[in-house]
Each structure stands twice: as structure tokens, then as C-alpha cells.
């Protein structure tokens, strides 16, 4: 109640998710001081007989390829994460049966284009066959966000700066 005037969320759209972020957000460069970040989210589903354990086991393989191609990621603030759905009854992802969200974050849209090009040219042929053994993601829906950090526990007085966007 203390902060209900600051930020409120609709109850029906909230989702219970566990998340794993294998790469630190500052590993490939810092995010802008404004708090801005660009992100792409993919809706993913386990293949029959597969589970969260398979998805979690894949993350070190993907992470290793990211680090092996670090020249292509430098300066982009690239990091990624998987949000694993707990299938809460009122969550917005329940209707679609989404098992997990694959999320990529960068410091700009141009940086995302760059990292996607690195993936397509250097990583896809290695990783995609392994990924499709346990999951598929919708290719017709990519949630794109121009986001801002609203709270930084290490900088209590942090305020996002929307002036340049």
C-alpha cells in the first residue's frame, strides 16, 4: 500500500516465473546511465517428454558460445535469461501454455541487431539443433520492449531519464 501510487500492476496479468540469467548485464558493456535497455522475448514450449531441466542444462552450452564469440557482443551490454513459467492460474502466459520465455537484453536496438547477426552467422548452426531437441519457440511472436530500470538497489536515488527517448 505504501507504494501503490508509484507502480501498480493488474492482478490478472501477473505471472509467477523463476528466472536464470547466466551472463552479467555488465559483462559486454554497461547499460546507459538513463536506465534504458532494449529487449526481445520469445514464447517457448517444451517438446513432449522435455522439461525445465532440459532447458536449464542447455544454458551453459549457449553461454559458452556467447563467450566464444565475445568480439561480436562487446559494447552491446548483451545478456540473456530464461523465465520459467509456474503456470499460475491467472497469469497471462497460462492462456497460451507458454513454458518459458527466452529473453535477450542490450543497450540499444542497433546492438540487438548486431548480436542477432552474430548468433545467425556464428552460433545458430551449432546451438539450434541442440535447442530443438527439447523446445520450440514461436517465430511469429517476439515481444519487443524499450525498457527502463526503475529501481537500482545499489543506487537508492536512481531515477530513469526518458528525455532522450
Model feature map: region roles:
Residues 1-128, 133-165:
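Short S/T/G/P-rich N-terminal loop/turn motif that feeds into the first structured element of a domain
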Amino acid at each position: 500500500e505504501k507504494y501503490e501510487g508509484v507502480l501498480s500492476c493488474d492482478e490478472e496479468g501477473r505471472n509467477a516465473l523463476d528466472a536464470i540469467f547466466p551472463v552479467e548485464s555488465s559483462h559486454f558493456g554497461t547499460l546507459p546511465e538513463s536506465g534504458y535497455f532494449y529487449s526481445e522475448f520469445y514464447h517457448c514450449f517444451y517438446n513432449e517428454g522435455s522439461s525445465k531441466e532440459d532447458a536449464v542444462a542447455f544454458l551453459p552450452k549457449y553461454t559458452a558460445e556467447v563467450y566464444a564469440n565475445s568480439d561480436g557482443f562487446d559494447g552491446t551490454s548483451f545478456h540473456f535469461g530464461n523465465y520459467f513459467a509456474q503456470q499460475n492460474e491467472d497469469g497471462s502466459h497460462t492462456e497460451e501454455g507458454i513454458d518459458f520465455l527466452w529473453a535477450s537484453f542490450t543497450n540499444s536496438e542497433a546492438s540487438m541487431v548486431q548480436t542477432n547477426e552474430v548468433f545467425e552467422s556464428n552460433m545458430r548452426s551449432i546451438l539450434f539443433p541442440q535447442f530443438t531437441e527439447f523446445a520450440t519457440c514461436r517465430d511469429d511472436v517476439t515481444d519487443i520492449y524499450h525498457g527502463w530500470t526503475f529501481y537500482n538497489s545499489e543506487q537508492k536515488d536512481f531515477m530513469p531519464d526518458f528525455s532522450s527517448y
